[in-house]
C-alpha cells in the first residue's frame, strides 16, 4: 500500500518513521526552500543537503519516478520537491497524508486518494479528508478524528518544560537568516542567537537550542525561526519528539484501520424508483442548489476505496455517476420493486469483487447523509462479522444498511 505524505518537516517525519518501521513504502513532498525549525529530525533537510538521516532512517532527495522506486527499494524515504504534490496523479497513492501543518487546508481534497488524512487544524473529516489527527499537546494529542475537526490553532505553543511562548525564536526583520547559535547549544536569556535581515534575535529564556532554521534561507518578519528547550537534554535535539511520535501513532492507527477495509466492502446506491408518490422524478428535484442525486454522488466521490455501484433507470444520473468513476447498472423495470434494484446491484458487485465481505446499501434521496456516517458503518463492520449494521436516529433505524456477505443468498431471494 503506497503512502504519499505532503510535507517533510519534523512532525511529518515522525509520521513517516512510524509508517516506515511498519513496512509501508513512503514518498514525501516538500517546497524548494523548507522552513523546518527542528531540521535535525526532519527529512526536509534532504532538499538542501541531498539526504537526511533521522534515527537510522535515510531520507534522500529524488527527482524522477525511477529515483523514487530505487530509494524505496533501498529502504530509504524519497523526498521530492513538489509544492503542490502534483506527483499524486502519476504515483497514485493508496493513502495521502497532508502533514504540511499550515493550520489551514492548502488544497487537499477527499478525492485525492482512496484514503486522505489531514494532520492538525484546518481539515474537517467527512468533507476534505476521511479523518483528522489531533496535533495540540494535551490529553487528545494523536487522537484519530473521523467526524469533525482538530482543536483550532490558538497561536500559543504547547507547554514544554514549563515554558510556552518564551521558548519561540521569531525573526525580528524580513531578510536572510543568519544563525549565531547552533542546534544543541546552551544559550542564556538575552543572548543573540541569530540575525534576520541584519537585525539581532535574542533568546527570551535559558536553555538548549532545540531547533533553528538553516543559514541563508529567506524569512518574513515574525516567522518562527527556532525554539529553546528548558529541559536541556541535548539528545532531544536529535531525536523525534514525543509529540511527533504521538501524531505518528495516530496516523498509523488510521492507516491500519483503513487497510482492513480497503476494497473489502462495496457501496451500492439504489436510484431506480419511479417516485410515484412524489409525482415526478424526485432525484432530479433541486435541493440546496443542485439535483437531489448530486448529493449522493458527492459522497460516492469520496468513497473511491471501495467498488461503487449505482442502480438507476435514468440516463442523466447514470452519466453523472460514470463521470466520477462509479459503475452503473440499468434498471428499466422499477415496478418490480426495490428488491429488483438490490439484486441487480449485488450481482454486479459480485462480478467486480467476488470476495467482498459486505455491502453498504444506500438510497439516493438522503441529502443529509454524511460521508462520515457511511465510512463509520464500514469501519464497524470489520469488527462485527456476520452482522447487519444500520444507521439510526434515536431509536429508529433506517438507511443506509450494511449487510454481511453471509446474507447475500437471502437478499437474492427477495421480491417486491
Go through the PLM ranges and name each one.
Residues 294-358, 372:
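Conserved N-terminal catalytic core of the sugar/cofactor nucleotidyltransferase
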Residues 101-103, 122, 273-275, 315, ...:
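Short glycine-rich anion-binding loops that position phosphate/pyrophosphate groups of nucleotides
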Residues 1-262:
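Well-ordered secondary-structure scaffolds
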Residues 406-416:
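Active-site oxyanion/phosphate-handling segment shared across diverse enzymes
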Residues 3, 265-267, 359:
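Conserved hydrophobic helix-helix packing surfaces used for dimerization/oligomerization
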Residues 43-49, 325-328, 346-348, 407:
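Short, hinge-like loop/turn segments at secondary-structure boundaries
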Residues 32-34, 263-315:
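N-terminal glycine-rich phosphate-binding loop and ensuing alpha1 helix
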Residues 335-405:
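Conserved beta-loop-beta/alpha segment of the NTase-like Rossmann-fold superfamily
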Amino acid at each position: 500500500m503506497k503512502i504519499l505524505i505532503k510535507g517533510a518537516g519534523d512532525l511529518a517525519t515522525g509520521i513517516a518513521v512510524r509508517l516506515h518501521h511498519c513496512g509501508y513504502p513512503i514518498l514525501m513532498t516538500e517546497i524548494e526552500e523548507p522552513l523546518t525549525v527542528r531540521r535535525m529530525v526532519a527529512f526536509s533537510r534532504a532538499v538542501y543537503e541531498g539526504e537526511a538521516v533521522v534515527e537510522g532512517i535515510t531520507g534522500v532527495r529524488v527527482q524522477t519516478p525511477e529515483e523514487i522506486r530505487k530509494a524505496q527499494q533501498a529502504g530509504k524515504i524519497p523526498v521530492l520537491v513538489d509544492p503542490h504534490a502534483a506527483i499524486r496523479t502519476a504515483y497514485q497513492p493508496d493513502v495521502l497524508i497532508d502533514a504540511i501543518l499550515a493550520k489551514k487546508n492548502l488544497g487537499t481534497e477527499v478525492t485525492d486518494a482512496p484514503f486522505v488524512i489531514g494532520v492538525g487544524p484546518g481539515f474537517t473529516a467527512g468533507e476534505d479528508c476521511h479523518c483528522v489527527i489531533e496535533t495540540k499537546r494535551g490529553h487528545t494529542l494523536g487522537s484519530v478524528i473521523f467526524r469533525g475537526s482538530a482543536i483550532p490553532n490558538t497561536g500559543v505553543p504547547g507547554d514544554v518544560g514549563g515554558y510556552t511562548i518564551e521558548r519561540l525564536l521569531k525573526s525580528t526583520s524580513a531578510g536572510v537568516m543568519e544563525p549565531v547559535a547552533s542546534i544543541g547549544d546552551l544559550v542564556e536569556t538575552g543572548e543573540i542567537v541569530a540575525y534576520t535581515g541584519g537585525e539581532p534575535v535574542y533568546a527570551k529564556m535559558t536553555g538548549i537550542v532545540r531547533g533553528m532554521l538553516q543559514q541563508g534561507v529567506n524569512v518574513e518578519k515574525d516567522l518562527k525561526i527556532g525554539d529553546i528547550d528548558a529541559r536541556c537534554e541535548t539528545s532531544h535535539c536529535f531525536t523525534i519528539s514525543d509529540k511527533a511520535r504521538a501524531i505518528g501513532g495516530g496516523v498509523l492507527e488510521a492507516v491500519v484501520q483503513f487497510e482492513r477495509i480497503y476494497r473489502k466492502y462495496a457501496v451500492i446506491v439504489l436510484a431506480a424508483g419511479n417516485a410515484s408518490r412524489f409525482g415526478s422524478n424526485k432525484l432530479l428535484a433541486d435541493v440546496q442548489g443542485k439535483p437531489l442525486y448530486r448529493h449522493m454522488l458527492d459522497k460516492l466521490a469520496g468513497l473511491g476505496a471501495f467498488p461503487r455501484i449505482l442502480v438507476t433507470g435514468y440516463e442523466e444520473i447514470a452519466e453523472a455517476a460514470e463521470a466520477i468513476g462509479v459503475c452503473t447498472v440499468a434498471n428499466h423495470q422499477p415496478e418490480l420493486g426495490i428488491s429488483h434494484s438490490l439484486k441487480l446491484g449485488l450481482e454486479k458487485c459480485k462480478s467486480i469483487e467476488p470476495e467482498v465481505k459486505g455491502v453498504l446499501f444506500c438510497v439516493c434521496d438522503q441529502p443529509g447523509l454524511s460521508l462520515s456516517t457511511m465510512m463509520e458503518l464500514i469501519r464497524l463492520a470489520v469488527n462485527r462479522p456476520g452482522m447487519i449494521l444500520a444507521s439510526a436516529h434515536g431509536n429508529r433505524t433506517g438507511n443506509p444498511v450494511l449487510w454481511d456477505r453471509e446474507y447475500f443468498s437471502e437478499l437474492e431471494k427477495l421480491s417486491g
